[in-house]
């Protein structure tokens, strides 16, 4: 089994949306891949729509990703702008994609 973390860099994701994203991701991946949606720890923005919000969410994303990386084989940043992707690639020992 390949375990993939889908990291949501914002905070305050409703549980039903988390479940929806997880369900859709797992429907779209092969059977040997398991995707788990993880929300970054705060403080941080609810949505990321500006350069300020991109930077604001990066520290929480890095803290969360560093703490959980041993549980996963890869990490996907669940945000269109891929906030913090370069820093996360430096920090983690697992592949990071946007």
Name what the model sees in each region.
Residues 89-98:
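Short, acidic/small-residue loops that bind anionic groups at enzyme active sites
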Residues 18, 87-90:
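Short amphipathic alpha-helical segments
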Residues 14, 85-86:
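Glycine/Thr-rich phosphate-binding loops of Rossmann-like dinucleotide-binding domains
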Residues 73-79:
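Periplasmic-binding protein-like
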Residues 31-33, 72-73, 94:
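Short, well-ordered coil/turn segments that N-cap beta-strands
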Residues 28, 86-87:
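Short hydrophobic alpha-helices and adjacent helix-cap/hinge residues
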Residues 1-59:
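N-terminal glycine-rich anion-binding loop in soluble enzyme alpha/beta folds
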Residues 51, 55-71, 84:
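Short, well-structured alpha-helical segments in soluble
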């Amino acid at each position: 089994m390949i375990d993939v973390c889908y990291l949501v860099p914002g905070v305050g994701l409703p549980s039903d949306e988390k479940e929806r994203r997880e369900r859709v991701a797992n429907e779209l991946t092969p059977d040997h891949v398991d995707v788990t949606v993880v929300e970054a720890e705060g403080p941080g923005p609810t949505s990321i729509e500006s350069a300020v919000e991109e930077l604001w969410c990066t520290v929480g994303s890095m803290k969360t990703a560093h703490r959980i990386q041993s549980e996963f084989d890869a990490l996907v940043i669940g945000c269109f702008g891929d906030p913090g992707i370069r820093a996360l690639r430096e920090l983690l020992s697992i592949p990071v994609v946007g």
